[in-house]
């Protein structure tokens, strides 16, 4: 059984301080996109995991954590074989590991017909990682607390297009948060502040990744004719551009946009919404870089 394991974007991310446990409190808007990995689950005589990136075929892979949590909860202990084909870069800030973990939970529930509810899967996901519960939402959601509390967001972002810019070097989440200063916190939580679409972690990450700061400024210059938003997803290192889909209704503007994407080596993707009674399905452009 093959399952699509999609990436996500943080369209904005606001830090509000630290909790009593020392974790950073935040508000973020999540959007699942039609770019991602493929996870295959099959019955086996023993537990195995094969990945096209050998460094991820380890006991530390979150797929194994999902399997253990699923077994503890359901008492289903049959051995399984996983095959993971990665396209999402490591340390990209677009939820690759979290998506794989969530997809593994969904796949196990389908494979063994354990009939766990979506709410149950979401609660299990909270035990794995901050972003994991997102993937049991519709695909558009607001994250609060430490990002793991998911609020439905029905204003589906289908009218926006996104262009991704990956980095050859990822960013560790712990490094991004270790460079946060108190002055980085957003003290306002009203709707206007949230929709400014800033990512407060940019201030932290740019302190030790000047290359990403310079890349963002370069992208802002390239995209300025289209008044597009340029931001960073999560803890980085992925930068992204968003612009209204309606801009492409003008053929000359559409051509200019796609020329800019090609010249800047971006990847054009779309927002993705989960099937009402199933999982996320990949779209036709999954394997195709923007041209």
Swiss-Prot record:
It holds the Pfam family GHMP_kinases_N. One of its GO terms (molecular function) is ATP binding. It comes from the Bacteria. Pathway: Isoprenoid biosynthesis; isopentenyl diphosphate biosynthesis via DXP pathway; isopentenyl diphosphate from 1-deoxy-D-xylulose 5-phosphate: step 3/6. Transmembrane segments: none annotated. ATP binds at residues 89-99. Keywords: ATP-binding, Isoprene biosynthesis, Kinase, Nucleotide-binding, Transferase. Its EC number is 2.7.1.148. GO terms for biological process: isopentenyl diphosphate biosynthetic process, methylerythritol 4-phosphate pathway; terpenoid biosynthetic process. InterPro entries: GHMP_kinase_C_sf (IPR036554), GHMP_kinase_N_dom (IPR006204), IspE (IPR004424), Ribosomal_Su5_D2-typ_SF (IPR020568), Ribsml_uS5_D2-typ_fold_subgr (IPR014721). It catalyses: 4-CDP-2-C-methyl-D-erythritol + ATP = 4-CDP-2-C-methyl-D-erythritol 2-phosphate + ADP + H(+). This is 4-diphosphocytidyl-2-C-methyl-D-erythritol kinase. It comes from Chlamydia caviae (strain ATCC VR-813 / DSM 19441 / 03DC25 / GPIC) (Chlamydophila caviae). The lineage of its organism: Bacteria, Pseudomonadati, Chlamydiota, Chlamydiia, Chlamydiales.
């Amino acid at each position: 059984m093959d399952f699509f394991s999609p990436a996500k974007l943080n369209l904005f991310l606001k830090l509000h301080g630290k909790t009593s446990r020392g974790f950073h409190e935040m508000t973020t808007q999540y959007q699942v996109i039609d770019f991602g990995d493929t996870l295959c689950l099959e019955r086996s005589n023993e537990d195995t995991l094969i990945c096209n990136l050998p460094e991820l075929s380890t006991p530390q892979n979150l797929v194994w954590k999902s399997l253990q949590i699923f077994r503890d909860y359901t008492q289903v202990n049959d051995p399984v074989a996983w095959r993971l084909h990665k396209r999402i870069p490591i340390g990209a800030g677009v939820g690759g590991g979290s998506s794989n973990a969530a997809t593994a939970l969904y796949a196990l529930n389908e494979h063994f017909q354990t009939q766990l509810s979506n709410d149950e899967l979401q609660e299990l996901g909270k035990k794995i990682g901050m972003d994991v519960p997102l993937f049991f939402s519709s695909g558009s959601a607001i994250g609060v607390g430490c990002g793991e509390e998911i609020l439905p967001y029905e204003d589906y972002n289908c009218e926006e297009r996104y262009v991704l810019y990956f980095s050859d070097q990822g960013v560790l989440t712990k490094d991004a948060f270790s460079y946060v200063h108190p002055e980085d916190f957003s003290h306002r939580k009203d709707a206007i502040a949230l929709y400014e679409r800033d990512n407060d972690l940019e201030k932290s990450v740019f302190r030790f990744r000047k290359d990403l700061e310079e890349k963002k400024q370069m992208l802002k210059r390239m995209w300025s004719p289209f008044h597009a938003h340029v931001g960073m997803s999560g803890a980085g290192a992925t930068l992204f551009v968003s612009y209204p889909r309606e801009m492409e209704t003008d053929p000359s503007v559409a051509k200019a946009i796609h020329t800019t994407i090609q010249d800047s080596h971006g990847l054009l993707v779309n927002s993705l919404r989960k099937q009402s009674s199933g999982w996320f399905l990949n779209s036709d452009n999954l394997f195709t870089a923007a041209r």
